[in-house]
């Protein structure tokens, strides 16, 4: 977990091994300076994971993202956009493939 601003994880969220969560990016404006020495971009972003959600192994959650309650994020998925409540999202980038309540 690499958070510069805000992370909210609801109750009974299951994080599988090797899940990576971040709300910031690295600067990359000068090709003569290594990325690690260019600083971190903080844009007031917030990551939120709703209660009862399950985040699969090796999933990556990046940026200003809200994962709703009782969601399933598939293994190896890269979440870059919001996932509504009760949805299953998979892939890179992750996309919703099912609404559990439907």
Identify the meaning behind each predicted range.
Residues 1-65, 92, 100-101:
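Flexible, glycine/small-residue-enriched loop-and-beta-strand segment within the central core
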Residues 85, 101-102:
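Short amphipathic alpha-helical segments
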């Amino acid at each position: 977990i690499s958070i510069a601003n805000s992370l909210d994880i609801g109750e009974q969220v299951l994080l599988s091994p090797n899940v990576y969560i971040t709300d910031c990016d690295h600067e990359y404006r000068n090709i003569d300076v290594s990325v690690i020495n260019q600083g971190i971009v903080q844009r007031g972003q917030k990551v939120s994971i709703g209660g009862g959600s399950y985040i699969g192994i090796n999933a990556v959650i990046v940026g200003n993202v809200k994962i709703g309650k009782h969601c399933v994020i598939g293994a190896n998925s890269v979440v870059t956009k919001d996932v509504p409540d009760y949805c299953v999202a998979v892939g890179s980038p992750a996309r919703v493939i099912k609404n559990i309540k439907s």
